[in-house]
Amino acid sequence: MAKIYYDDDADLSIIQNRQVAVIGYGSQGHAHALNLRDSGVDVRVGLRDGSSSIAKAEAQGLRVLSIEDACEEADLIMVLVPDQNQRQLYAEHIAPHLKDGDALFFAHGFNVHFGYIKAPQGVDVCMVAPKGPGHIVRREYSDGRGVPVLVCVEQDASGIAWDLTRSYAKALGGLRAGGIETSFREETETDLFGEQAVLCGGLSHLIQAGFETLVTAGYQPEMAYFEVCHEMKMIVDLIIEGGISKLRWSISDTAEYGDYVSGPRVIDDHVKKNMKAVLDDIQNGAFAKRFIADQDAGAPQSKKFREGEAKHPIEATGKELRKMYSWLAAADDDYTEGSVAR
């Protein structure tokens, strides 16, 4: 079983005696910067010149500097920008300002684990990764609670990297809920596998396949959408609340029996073999190389995939049906169809 840390396992004064730079001010960046500041930590935010986030960060009372100046001032740097941008940002704007005794923090291990970022030997390399989106991390902290975090140390140059990591996690509010000890390797590989095989790739293609099966068999697209996509939220909510057992307890006897007899026909040993192949590509670095190569080329594959998937018939059907639900109209007012959130 994993080792879990709580507030009593951390000394907040350790992080309060550091100069922290949060690089990036997106979903996670704003939560980290604000929570640390409200925990008595000296925080500055590092942003590129012209960033649209500068005004937002300053309006929330934070000191904003260029990335270079923020890193020069700080002795602890938390990198909270997209994976594909970290390598260049690190090489050009962060690495020149690192000194022995500094600490480099991440919320995801992709670039460190796969070797795209290699810190000097005299620098601590640590991770504090909230298991929730930034606005929830901030909301829970403000309400006196917290979101669970993953904590790990890749390089303990100072001899106190673990103490520093736990202190950071406490300032973030994560140890109110619990900090689960892991490693950069474990966090990175399980995170990528979950995204690709189950949560994003697996789920989206399962929904599409179910939709296609029903429509091809002559059923109305609207009925197919309701049955294989729209009701997904209810199912996921039950699983989040009480696991698969609560889901099966909550559904009808007919649905439960169908789960037992038909689920294994869809998710069979062949699917597990494919999942293992996906995991192999993650573990051996093949996926990382493919992703970075695509990003370095201007993301032609990603753009092609995105454009192609947007044309799937389930999208047009869902767009019309969602208009029938008045409470969904404003549920995603920060989403622009065809755009990318990052």
Curated annotation (Swiss-Prot):
Q: Which HAMAP family match?
A: IlvC
Give the residues annotated as active site: 108
- Report which gene this protein is encoded by: ilvC
Enumerate the residues binding Mg(2+) 1.
191, 195
Entry similarity comment: Belongs to the ketol-acid reductoisomerase family.
Pathway listed for it is: Amino-acid biosynthesis; L-isoleucine biosynthesis; L-isoleucine from 2-oxobutanoate: step 2/4; Amino-acid biosynthesis; L-valine biosynthesis; L-valine from pyruvate: step 2/4
Q: Which GO terms describe its cellular component?
A: cytosol
Q: Which GO terms describe its biological process?
A: isoleucine biosynthetic process; L-valine biosynthetic process
Required cofactor names: Mg(2+)
Per the UniProt entry, what species is this protein from, by scientific name?
Answer: Cutibacterium acnes (strain DSM 16379 / KPA171202) (Propionibacterium acnes)
Cofactor, how bound (note): Binds 2 magnesium ions per subunit.
**Keywords attached to this entry:** Amino-acid biosynthesis, Branched-chain amino acid biosynthesis, Magnesium, Metal-binding, NADP, Oxidoreductase
NCBIfam families cross-referenced by the UniProt entry: ilvC (TIGR00465), PRK05479.1 (NF004017), PRK13403.1 (NF009940)
- Entry EC number(s): 1.1.1.86
Domain KARI N-terminal Rossmann, which positions? Answer: 2-182
Presence of the UniProt keyword Magnesium in the record? yes
- Residues reported in the UniProt entry to bind NADP(+): 25-28, 48, 51, 53, 83-86, 134
Catalysed reaction(s) here are: (2R)-2,3-dihydroxy-3-methylbutanoate + NADP(+) = (2S)-2-acetolactate + NADPH + H(+); (2R,3R)-2,3-dihydroxy-3-methylpentanoate + NADP(+) = (S)-2-ethyl-2-hydroxy-3-oxobutanoate + NADPH + H(+)
Which GO molecular function annotations are given, in alphabetical order? ketol-acid reductoisomerase activity; magnesium ion binding; NADP binding
Positions that bind substrate: 252
User: Lineage of the native species?
Assistant: Bacteria, Bacillati, Actinomycetota, Actinomycetes, Propionibacteriales
For this entry, the protein name equals: Ketol-acid reductoisomerase (NADP(+))
